[in-house]
């Protein structure tokens, strides 16, 4: 994978937490096949897997939270084994999905830093600065 030759990985979103246990090999037609339920299985946790393989490389993950933002990010950091979590408070009108700004905290193995409300490009620059210091 590309991570083998990378200096760092920034995992900005979970690709999918679950996937169908038995994917269909054809389009399911509404008229022909009744779909009562879809059995799901957990997918590989990419952030945790990259963190296990990181060696001296840096791995940063994200957490979109609506409450207990820092506490949940600290738990995620410990659980995943990455170098830092960028925790976004998506309960705010000026942060997260569908906005141009984010209210975030950097939660790392060396401590927690609350950031002001930043534009997404400003937050990206802050994350790149963080990478240089990890």
Where are these regions (language model features)?
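Small-residue (G/A/S/T)-rich helix-start motifs and N-terminal tracts that mark the onset
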Residues: 1-8, 82, 89, 94-134
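Glycine-rich phosphate/dinucleotide-binding loop and adjoining beta-alpha-beta core of small-molecule
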Residues: 1-94, 105
